[in-house]
Amino acid sequence: MSRKVAFALIFCLSAGSVFAQEQSAKTTSEKTKEMFERALSRAESATAVSHQIKDVFARAAKAVVKIHGVDEHSEICGTGFFIDPTGTLYTAYTVGGEAGNFTIEFNGKKYPARQLLADIRSGTAMLKIDEATPALPIGKSEQLEVATPVVSIGFPLDLPETPNFGMVAGFDRKYLGRYFSTTHMRLNLPSQRGEAGAPLLNMKGEVVGIVVSSLENNAACYAVPIEAAEKIRGDFMRFGEARHGWVGINVSMARQPVEGSLAEMTQIMEDTPAARSGIKAGDILLQVGRKKVTQPEDVLDASFFITAGDVVPVTVMRGNQKLTFSVQATMHPASRTGLLLAAPGTPAMNQQAIPLSLRSDVPPTP
């Protein structure tokens, strides 16, 4: 091999090595830049979320209050929030349901409050003070999905007003084999004693639920949808009481779907609104009021929103015929029983069966 050829070969190898090193350095630099940009993006996202939470808290906190009361065992305290400008507020039944001598801490002062309504089936209560107040806007829990971010504001333990941030973990109709009276939202949201009755807010600052119980060592909690409380408030405005409706049907799983529904009428109780309307065992239930039915469990939500005395359209499939009956609902037999409805074959549960009360029990003062 000539010296010129050897020199040229060595030069090419050296140049290739230098080029490879430059490319490697460039690749490393690009990767470092990409990692930095991703970290910066995450930091900016976290900052944006933090600002959003602060904004929700700043706008909503002035309408959230601490509630004191006394029941037959001890003093209690929990959280509530105003829903109109005339001093009406929502809280959890465990706070405002069975206690009395209520005092509300609002705007740096204490005000006496009275109970308007306590409904054990929904797990909610309404109190009122005679003052002009701010009010939280009402949202729609139906717009929430699993992993939707949410904020609660409450008074944990004996601490000041505190925001909590988490997300929707699920929509449950039962807990430990026993059914709720309506679907509850399970939240990856830490909750302590004293936070029962706290508003659950979407990122617009609208109320979408009320915190009612805690789970898993306070790392998660349940909230009842705001629509359930609004249903009870609507009853109160019309009748002065909660009026849970009932039509008198039992449903079970059909062998095969009919028009998309597996809910088959298995029993029509005698002398009930359903029996008088002409509904029969064997009919496949498609819709109750505005609620579509596809599974037997759908009847829980559908029936919860029925008001006694109202005429409710009930649509069924009977053979090849789609029929709609007008059924006038009567008062639900369980209107004054437990918050949790028992599953078939299990004993009934009352509100004390909720995993953990979130109210704070305080030893009575001498």
Whereabouts are the PLM-identified features?
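Bacterial N-terminal signal peptides that target proteins for export
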Residues: 1-7
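Bacterial N-terminal signal peptides
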Residues: 8-16
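N-terminal activation segment of mature serine protease catalytic domains
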Residues: 21-82, 88-93, 101, 124, ...
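PDZ/PDZ-like groove recognition
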Residues: 25, 186, 190, 237-302, ...
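C-terminal cap/linker of serine protease catalytic domains
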Residues: 26-55, 152, 156, 203, ...
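Active-site region of chymotrypsin-like
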Residues: 61-63, 70, 125-136, 162-219, ...
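Conserved active-site neighborhood of the chymotrypsin/trypsin-like protease fold
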Residues: 66-77, 82-162, 190-193, 258, ...
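A structural signal for short beta-strand/turn segments enriched in small hydrophobics and glycine
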Residues: 87, 147-153, 205, 274, ...
